[in-house]
């Protein structure tokens, strides 16, 4: 099957396997040898399937335009499934009608499937998250620091993660994301990383001992997956496939900070528990998120 992706960052070209910013959508394209195409400039090639990633800030995509070069057109979820409800009213209905007009919808998590079916989308499929760790080695030496997965805004739940991370009695690190607040640099017990490319981030992640990402905004769940690649135990909220598949012992209900705190204390105090969670992460990544397993799962949807 010949596939193309369409997004606001597309330029009708294919990514190399060592692309420095190979985030999930790029990894999908790499695995399928698919170009990432523009939404407003058609490629010269024809495709069996076009997968459209609707931009968060400009949802008025015309699927009929994409159908000129694609036999089938699917929509790929971008962000949490409720994100479109912050649009202006006309854009909310345009987004809804666009979903309904697609041949099928791809979503991030099993927990998203029923939502899209409830909207009236009859064919809803899960597109697993993916990373292409080309020439990147999993960690071989264990550090003693803790990394949290986002900044101090409701989108990332950084405050929740910070409260839990303190229980590990280790130096706390955090990435610098686009929603980072200026005053965060004044938090004395967090070391902030500079902005990085995806490859720099994955290499840097290898030095940490514990991950905490209590993010209520459920989408691709790449932090939990990235930690699992390095066999790093990660505490996170239920609802993300990557979290539940790779870190089952460390998955807590949304808002259950009490249990999350206990999990962090256990990881610090009980080496046997830590090792068990680390092995679960390694096993979960191998079973669900290698490129081989991703392609195997991708091919199943067309052979059922």
Please provide the spans of the model-predicted regions.
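A charged, aromatic-enriched C-terminal amphipathic alpha-helix characteristic of glycosyltransferases
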Residues: 20, 269-303
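Conserved acidic donor-binding segment of nucleotide-sugar-dependent glycosyltransferases
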Residues: 248-257, 266-271
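Conserved catalytic-core segment of nucleotide-activated headgroup transferases in glycan assembly
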Residues: 16-21, 133-135, 139-186, 192-198
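Donor nucleotide-sugar binding/catalytic pocket of nucleotide-sugar-dependent glycosyltransferases
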Residues: 103-115, 121-136
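N-terminal pre-catalytic "stem/leader" segment of glycosyltransferase-like enzymes
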Residues: 1-65, 115, 249-253, 296, ...
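Short alpha-helical segment that forms part of, or immediately flanks, the ligand-binding pocket
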Residues: 202, 224-230, 243
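Membrane-proximal helix-turn-helix segments that form the acceptor-binding/catalytic region
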Residues: 87-105
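Acidic donor-binding loop of glycosyltransferase active sites
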Residues: 206-219, 232
């Amino acid at each position: 099957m010949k596939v193309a992706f369409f997004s606001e960052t597309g330029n009708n070209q294919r990514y190399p396997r060592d692309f420095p910013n190979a985030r999930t959508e790029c990894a999908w394209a790499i695995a399928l040898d698919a170009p990432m195409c523009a939404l407003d400039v058609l490629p010269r090639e024809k495709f069996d399937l076009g997968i459209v990633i609707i931009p968060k800030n400009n949802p008025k995509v015309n699927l009929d335009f994409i159908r000129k070069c694609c036999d089938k057109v699917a929509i790929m979820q971008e962000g949490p499934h409720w994100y479109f409800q912050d649009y202006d009213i006309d854009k909310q209905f345009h987004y809804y009608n666009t979903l309904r007009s697609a041949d099928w919808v791809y979503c991030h998590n099993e927990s998203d499937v029923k939502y899209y079916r409830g909207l009236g989308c009859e064919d809803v499929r899960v597109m697993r998250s993916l990373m292409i760790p080309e020439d990147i080695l999993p960690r071989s030496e264990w550090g003693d620091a803790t990394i949290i997965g986002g900044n101090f805004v409701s989108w990332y739940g950084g405050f929740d993660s910070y409260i839990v991370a303190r229980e590990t009695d280790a130096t706390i690190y955090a990435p610098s994301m686009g929603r980072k607040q200026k005053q965060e640099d004044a938090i004395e017990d967090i070391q902030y990383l500079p902005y990085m490319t995806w490859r720099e981030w994955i290499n840097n992640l290898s030095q940490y001992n514990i991950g905490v990402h209590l993010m209520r905004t459920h989408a691709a769940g790449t932090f939990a997956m990235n930690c699992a690649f390095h066999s790093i135990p990660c505490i996170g909220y239920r609802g993300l496939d990557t979290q539940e598949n790779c870190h089952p012992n460390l998955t807590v209900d949304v808002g259950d900070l009490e249990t999350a705190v206990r999990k962090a204390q256990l990881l610090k105090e009980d080496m046997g528990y830590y090792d068990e969670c680390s092995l679960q992460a390694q096993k979960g990544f191998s079973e669900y998120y290698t490129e081989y397993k991703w392609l195997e799962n991708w091919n199943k949807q067309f052979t059922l």
